[in-house]
Amino acid sequence: MFFCSSMPLLAEALPLKNTQLGDPEFIKFHGLKLAYMTGSMANGIASENLVISSGNEGLLSSFGAAGLIPSVIEKAINNIQQALPDGPYAFNLIHSPSEDAIERAAVDLYLKYRVRTIEASAFLGLTPNIVRYRVAGLRRSKENQVEITNRVIAKISRIEVASKFMAPAPEAILNKLLNDKSITREQAQLAAAVPMADDITVEADSGGHTDNRPLVSLLPAIIALREKFQEQYGYSDTIRVGAAGGIGTPASALAAFMMGAAYVVTGSINQACVEAAASDHSKGLLAKAEMADVIMAPAAD
């Protein structure tokens, strides 16, 4: 360190540690070491091994449950919970507009085995399934506060979808769940005090379901939307907004944090890692791919 000997040293800025990046509330809420998450890749590509390895290092990883039959998801839940009894881990809940039974079966498993964190993706709006998962985990504490035991991280790429997850559960869906005896009357009442999601992942121009929005435009817009909903509903806890899509280097992760992201999520780059359930051939191609080698294509689902 060099400074002018004739001038007093008033302050010294030490290098930031990676544990200081992002929102400390995200780290505390999910029991992590870093404000870093690996997103779900369908058909189990985001594998049990990836989730467990990440969890052991204090990172939140979401199992790629989309496209898998219930028995395979159930086996993954058992294996991951055995390896990470205290977490952290998450499971994906993908919206299935043409096959409601698939979405419902996943929620049945998550409630049965007390999977406490889900990553909701590809939703166009709220469904009774995701509302049931969220609201069935609400209870009143001894201090008369609303306790949220079923956590939702909503991955979105459109403002109108983010709005639905930042608002409380719709009354019409709550009434339907009440009539079905899927939730209690107290849970329906408590639902008015909390948003549908604890965290909103802004999925910009990613390798998954995306609307190709640039992160530099979409992230600030969603953060501003969050401020509007916080003021409108007066939530006791702040909805956190993270960033995903195109975060493939330390520099791009730092840029997201500097724009105000509470956390960052990586996805496609993890498909090339040892723990991913992809073939060695696929991993080799991904490791060699450049930006110009990638183009948008229809999603398999």
Over which residues does each language-model region extend?
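A structural signal for short, well-ordered beta-strand segments and their strand-loop junctions
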Residues: 118-120, 243, 265
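Short glycine- and Lys/Arg-enriched binding-loop motifs that mark or flank ligand-binding interfaces
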Residues: 35, 241-242, 263
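Glycine-rich beta-strand-to-loop/alpha-helix junction loops that act as flexible
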Residues: 240-248
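Active-site entrance/lid segments in N-terminal catalytic domains of soluble metabolic enzymes
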Residues: 1-238, 270
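Catalytic or ion-translocation cores adjacent to nucleophile or general acid/base/metal-coordination motifs
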Residues: 71-73, 251-301
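Intervening/peripheral non-core polypeptide segments
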Residues: 229, 249-252
